[in-house]
């Protein structure tokens, strides 16, 4: 990358970071900013999409503690890592490979990790398509690894559906993601909408490997779920 390209990327990054006054559509997320990142005022970077898609900090902490307590992973693969909400918490326990297709979000994630004091050596960022990247991560089979997936839900409109189908995930349906993830590790966790069809999720388990679901509540309202596969015991935590 030459100097002009670096300047262009810096300029694009500055344009993508949402600063006050925030757009009207993001006001409720702005009012909730300290739940997204407790250290927000230290300079957290978020683009428009990240405001409504990042995992709230307490939820990310609970997920990280659950999987670490249960399987003590040597490596965590954070698919669809975005601006780093989950990566920050995972990296406190073990090395992380973060997969994100958007270079702007990767730049934001690296910055946000610095704010939380995460050494750059702790996280390997891979810019690319998740399924293509999964194929290059077969070495992870040699480690006690976890594949964590927080695929795009399709924006805030998901909440208007009575039941959210796993086929509505974009760009890949859940069955495709799950198949490729389990080729890397038997331990898989998926962060999904609160109204996800649990009957569809149950189809990915068996008598000996039932999926376990944590329902995350905020101020008494369900916000999202995390489904754990092959991890009996990685259950609900108070947040």
Swiss-Prot record:
Stated pH dependence: Optimum pH is 8.0.
Matching Pfam families: Methyltransf_15
EC number: 2.1.1.-
Mechanisms controlling activity: Substrate inhibited by S-adenosyl-L-homocysteine.
CDD domains: AdoMet_MTases (cd02440)
UniProt keyword Nucleus, yes or no: yes
Keyword terms of this UniProt record: Methyltransferase, Nucleus, S-adenosyl-L-methionine, Transferase
GO terms (BP aspect): 7-methylguanosine cap hypermethylation
Gene Ontology CC entries for this record: Cajal body; cytoplasm; cytosol; mitotic spindle; nucleolus; nucleus
A single MF term (Gene Ontology): RNA cap trimethylguanosine synthase activity
Membrane spanning stretches: none
Catalytic class of the enzyme: transferase
Deleted gene: phenotype: Abnormal exit from quiescence and abnormal Cajal body integrity.
Localization annotation: Nucleus, Cajal body
Keyword Membrane included in the entry's annotation: no
Broad class of the protein's primary localization: nucleus
Record's catalysed reaction(s): a 5'-end (N(7)-methyl 5'-triphosphoguanosine)-ribonucleoside in snRNA + S-adenosyl-L-methionine = a 5'-end (N(2),N(7)-dimethyl 5'-triphosphoguanosine)-ribonucleoside in snRNA + S-adenosyl-L-homocysteine + H(+); a 5'-end (N(7)-methyl 5'-triphosphoguanosine)-ribonucleoside in snoRNA + S-adenosyl-L-methionine = a 5'-end (N(2),N(7)-dimethyl 5'-triphosphoguanosine)-ribonucleoside in snoRNA + S-adenosyl-L-homocysteine + H(+); a 5'-end (N(2),N(7)-dimethyl 5'-triphosphoguanosine)-ribonucleoside in snRNA + S-adenosyl-L-methionine = a 5'-end (N(2),N(2),N(7)-trimethyl 5'-triphosphoguanosine)-ribonucleoside in snRNA + S-adenosyl-L-homocysteine + H(+); a 5'-end (N(2),N(7)-dimethyl 5'-triphosphoguanosine)-ribonucleoside in snoRNA + S-adenosyl-L-methionine = a 5'-end (N(2),N(2),N(7)-trimethyl 5'-triphosphoguanosine)-ribonucleoside in snoRNA + S-adenosyl-L-homocysteine + H(+)
PANTHER family assigned: S-ADENOSYLMETHIONINE-DEPENDENT METHYLTRANSFERASE RELATED, TRIMETHYLGUANOSINE SYNTHASE
Family membership: Belongs to the methyltransferase superfamily. Trimethylguanosine synthase family.
Oligomer status and interactors: Monomer. Interacts with mug174; both proteins are required to maintain Cajal body integrity.
Role of this protein: Catalyzes the two serial methylation steps for the conversion of the 7-monomethylguanosine (m(7)G) caps of snRNAs and snoRNAs to a 2,2,7-trimethylguanosine (m(2,2,7)G) cap structure. The enzyme is specific for guanine, and N7 methylation must precede N2 methylation. Required for pre-mRNA splicing, pre-rRNA processing and small ribosomal subunit synthesis. Involved in nucleolar structural organization.
Name of the protein in question: Trimethylguanosine synthase
């Amino acid at each position: 990358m030459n100097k002009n390209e670096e300047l262009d990327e810096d300029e694009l990054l500055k344009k993508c970071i949402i600063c006050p006054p925030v757009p009207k559509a993001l006001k409720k997320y702005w009012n909730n900013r300290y739940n997204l990142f407790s250290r927000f005022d230290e300079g957290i970077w978020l683009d428009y999409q990240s405001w409504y898609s990042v995992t709230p900090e307490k939820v990310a902490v609970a997920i990280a503690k659950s999987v670490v307590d249960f399987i003590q992973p040597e490596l965590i693969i954070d698919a669809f890592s975005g601006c780093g909400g989950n990566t920050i918490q995972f990296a406190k326990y073990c090395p992380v490979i973060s997969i994100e297709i958007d270079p702007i979000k990767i730049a934001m994630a690296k910055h946000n990790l610095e704010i939380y004091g995460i050494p750059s050596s702790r996280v390997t960022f891979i810019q690319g398509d998740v399924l293509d990247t999964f194929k290059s991560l077969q070495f992870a089979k040699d480690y006690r690894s976890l594949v964590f997936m927080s695929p795009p839900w399709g924006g805030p409109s998901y909440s208007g559906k009575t039941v959210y189908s796993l086929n509505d995930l974009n760009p890949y349906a859940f069955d495709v993601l799950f198949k490729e993830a389990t080729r890397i590790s038997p331990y898989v966790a998926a962060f999904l909408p609160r109204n996800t069809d649990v009957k569809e999720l149950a189809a990915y388990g068996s008598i000996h490997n039932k999926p376990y679901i944590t329902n995350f509540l905020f101020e008494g309202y369900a916000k999202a779920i995390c489904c754990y596969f092959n991890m009996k015991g990685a259950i609900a935590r108070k947040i």
